[in-house]
UniProtKB/Swiss-Prot annotation:
NCBIfam families: PRK00944.1 (NF002099). The chain crosses the membrane at residues 15-35, 65-85, 127-147, 151-171. Belongs to the UPF0314 family. GO terms for cellular component: plasma membrane. It comes from Brucella anthropi (strain ATCC 49188 / DSM 6882 / CCUG 24695 / JCM 21032 / LMG 3331 / NBRC 15819 / NCTC 12168 / Alc 37) (Ochrobactrum anthropi). It comes from the Bacteria. It is a multi-pass membrane protein. Keywords: Cell membrane, Membrane, Transmembrane, Transmembrane helix. Its main location: membrane. It is found in: Cell membrane. This is UPF0314 protein Oant_0840. Pfam families: DUF2585 (PF10755).
Length: 196
């Protein structure tokens, strides 16, 4: 066996282990949401690849305007693990990022957070994600992580800023406002968001 083949074998094994961990995390996430009473898919009876609706079908399909925020989560996790665990195999850093995103999805879909969104934002029609949407959000973070791993930091920062501005213009919401309104709501932001 050549030295190149021997050198690539541990790397492939780590990626394989990372992929298995990611699949296990996604399965646990979906199961947790199911047993917590979340609906599997949109009650409309279809699964759309994209839903631009901000009303009843929001967060019920595979992707929506908030998918942009989850891709940015992936960028942030890549940068975080590059700083705190730069020598860890990329596949394991990816699995850790997916684990954090999955935990966030479970928290985001808890009754406490759903009610907080409904009370403190313009999202009065938000009743939580479908399981399809929640798992797709985690996959979006995974994609964001992989994009950040491949592209120069300047490019991913530019993409993140573009996504934030685009969502702000189109739906008057984005990751930054979402965090602000979750942690310390401002009535003037809520009123502005309600003006759509």
């Amino acid at each position: 066996m050549s030295s190149l083949a021997q050198a690539s074998k541990p790397s492939a094994q780590r990626w394989g282990l990372g992929a298995l961990i990611v699949l296990a995390i996604l399965a646990v996430q979906a199961s947790w949401l199911y047993f917590d009473g979340r609906i599997a898919m949109c009650e409309c009876g279809t699964i759309k690849l994209w839903s631009g609706s901000l009303m009843t079908e929001n967060s019920q399909h595979i992707s929506d305007w908030y998918t942009l925020s989850h891709i940015i989560h992936g960028f942030l996790f890549y940068w975080l693990f590059t700083v705190i665990a730069p020598k860890a195999p990329l596949g394991l850093r990816l699995a850790a990022a997916v684990g954090i995103e999955a935990v966030w999805e479970l928290v985001e879909n808890s009754n406490f957070i759903i009610e907080r969104y409904r009370a403190n934002t313009s999202s009065v029609d938000y009743f939580g994600d479908s399981i399809v949407n929640s798992v797709a959000d985690t996959v979006a973070a995974l994609i964001g992580f992989l994009i950040a791993a491949k592209l120069p930091t300047k490019i991913t920062v530019a993409i993140a800023l573009f996504f934030e501005v685009l969502a702000l213009i189109v739906i008057r919401d984005n990751l930054t406002l979402n965090v602000i309104m979750l942690l310390h709501p401002f009535e003037f932001i809520k009123q502005w968001q309600s003006g759509l």
